[in-house]
């Protein structure tokens, strides 16, 4: 389990993270979402042990991450801005990773080499962005980390490779119980793989819970007629006779209210992660217009 407690970080007087708390259950695929500048990459770099907190702490299975080789040996980190040694090949990096990670799995490395059709003896710096991303996954997953930390993991990949990478992540979770933290702007892809979500804004955690609980506690209802009593309405729009409301309720609770109202038409719809994201940030002075699709 990963725990972040009261984490604060400032840069030159700017507070990037403020008293932030976060919990990633063991074996979870945790999606970290937020607008640009929310502090996602800063938070990820703290969890990866790159940044030192001004205050607060980050632990993996109870061990502090900062300046702790034992804790860092449990995690694999793939940043958005990849780094490889200047003239290093994949084979060079394999030897380097083997020296850092006692858990490095040569058999898995060879197996993944069949999926990632990359030249092993060419300098990685000559690879395209997508090829570099594939190389990073190949090497990092071969380390068999207990915690996989990913910042925009499929950026720069074509649709086929994006699907393959996501499948690789899920297979690793299923087979080895790997815990995954992934930050991405592609909320629809996150929705396909994540079971927990945290929404970050202005250096604070607005909301974190399981995706099922998040989607189950708020629904969208489209209907014709007057708005029934007994609903906590979070947002409303009318287009002609068709009304759409977002309510704080389960689907069953909303259906019970509308059944009693005996309206000529109603439909209860789940909210996507993208809609939840827009709605939750709508309460923090962000645009709400796209929540009604």
Could you describe each region identified by the protein language model?
Residues 68, 230, 276, 280:
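Residues that scaffold the ATP/ADP-binding catalytic core of kinase and kinase-like folds
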Residues 19, 218, 233-234, 263-265:
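A broad structural signal for short, well-ordered beta-strand segments within beta-sheet-rich domains
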Residues 2-4, 9-188, 192-195, 199-201:
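ABC transporter nucleotide-binding domains
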Residues 164-251:
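ABC transporter nucleotide-binding domain
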Residues 69, 215-218, 258, 281:
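Short, flexible helix/strand-to-coil boundary loops that buttress conserved ligand/catalytic motifs
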Residues 89, 210, 269-272:
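Short loop/turn segments at beta->alpha junctions
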Residues 246-293:
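C-terminal coupling/interaction segments
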């Amino acid at each position: 389990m990963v725990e972040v407690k009261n984490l604060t970080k400032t840069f030159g007087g700017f507070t990037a993270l403020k008293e932030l708390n976060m919990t990633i259950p063991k074996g979870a695929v945790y999606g970290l979402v937020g607008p640009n500048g929310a502090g996602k990459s800063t938070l990820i770099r703290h969890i990866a042990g790159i940044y030192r907190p001004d205050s607060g702490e980050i632990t993996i299975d109870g061990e502090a991450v900062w300046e702790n080789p034992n804790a860092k040996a449990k995690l694999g980190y793939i940043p958005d801005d990849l780094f490889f040694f200047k003239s290093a090949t994949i084979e060079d990096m394999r030897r380097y990773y083997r020296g850092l990670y006692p858990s490095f799995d040569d058999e898995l490395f060879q197996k993944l080499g069949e999926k990632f059709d990359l030249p092993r003896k060419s300098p990685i710096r000559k690879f395209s962005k997508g090829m570099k991303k594939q190389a990073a996954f190949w090497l990092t997953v071969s380390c068999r980390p207990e915690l996989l930390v990913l910042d925009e993991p499929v950026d720069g990949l074509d649709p086929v490779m994006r699907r393959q990478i996501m499948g690789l992540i899920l297979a690793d979770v299923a087979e080895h119980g790997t815990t995954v933290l992934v930050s991405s702007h592609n909320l629809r892809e996150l929705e396909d793989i994540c079971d927990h979500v945290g929404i970050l804004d202005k250096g604070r955690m607005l909301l974190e819970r399981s995706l099922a609980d998040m989607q189950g506690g708020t629904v969208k209802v489209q209907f014709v007629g007057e708005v029934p009593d007994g609903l906590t309405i979070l947002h409303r729009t009318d287009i002609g006779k068709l009304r759409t409301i977002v309510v704080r309720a389960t689907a069953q609770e909303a259906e019970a209210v509308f059944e009693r109202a005996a309206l000529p038409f109603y439909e209860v719809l789940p909210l996507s992660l993208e809609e939840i994201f827009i709605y939750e940030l709508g309460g923090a002075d962000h645009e709400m217009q796209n929540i009604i699709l």
